[in-house]
Amino acid sequence: MATPIIVGATIAGIAYSSRFLIRVIQRAKSKQLFEMVSTPGFTVETIEDGFENKMTPAEAANILGLKEESTKEEIKIRHKLLMIKNHPDKGGSSYLATKINEARNVLSSKNSN
């Protein structure tokens, strides 16, 4: 009679401990990220001006986070990663998705010539 109670309590304890451990690990990871971002050597470059009427290769490279001389494969990979993060169907901005696509097209056409 006592065996099912002991087994149930043991399973509940293991589940609770696992949940607690997962939360501790997640907090530690977010704390490390916060410390990395708040260090003086970590800077984020921002652009004060908006987008140009016609996107330039320099602006396209800046949007994708690449160099203007990047290969088609690098452009393709970076475009895919940014679209996964910013796709409108996943809650991202359709404006940003449009700019990411335009940047890919500008860099791809520049590098094919």
UniProtKB/Swiss-Prot annotation:
Mitochondrial intermembrane-side positions: 1-4
Intervals, Mitochondrial matrix compartment: 23-113
GO biological process: protein import into mitochondrial matrix; regulation of cardiolipin metabolic process
Record keywords: Chaperone, Membrane, Mitochondrion, Mitochondrion inner membrane, Protein transport, Translocation, Transmembrane, Transmembrane helix, Transport
UniProt cross-references to Pfam families, sorted A to Z: DnaJ
Signal peptide segment: none
Topology within the bilayer: Single-pass membrane protein
Domain J stretches: 59-113
InterPro entries (alphabetical): DnaJ_domain, J_dom_sf
Chief location of this protein within or outside the cell: mitochondrion
SMART domains tied to this protein: DnaJ (SM00271)
Any one GO cellular component localisation term in the record: PAM complex, Tim23 associated import motor
Locations listed in the record: Mitochondrion inner membrane
Record GO terms (molecular function): ATPase activator activity
Coiled coil regions in record: none
Family, similarity comment: Belongs to the TIM14 family.
The protein's assembly and partners: Interacts with PHB2; the interaction associates DNAJC19 with the prohibitin complex. Interacts with TIMM16/PAM16. May be a component of the PAM complex at least composed of a mitochondrial HSP70 protein, GRPEL1 or GRPEL2, TIMM44, TIMM16/PAM16 and TIMM14/DNAJC19.
UniProt function note: Mitochondrial co-chaperone which forms a complex with prohibitins to regulate cardiolipin remodeling. May be a component of the PAM complex, a complex required for the translocation of transit peptide-containing proteins from the inner membrane into the mitochondrial matrix in an ATP-dependent manner. May act as a co-chaperone that stimulate the ATP-dependent activity.
Protein known as: Mitochondrial import inner membrane translocase subunit TIM14
Organism expressing this protein natively: Dictyostelium discoideum
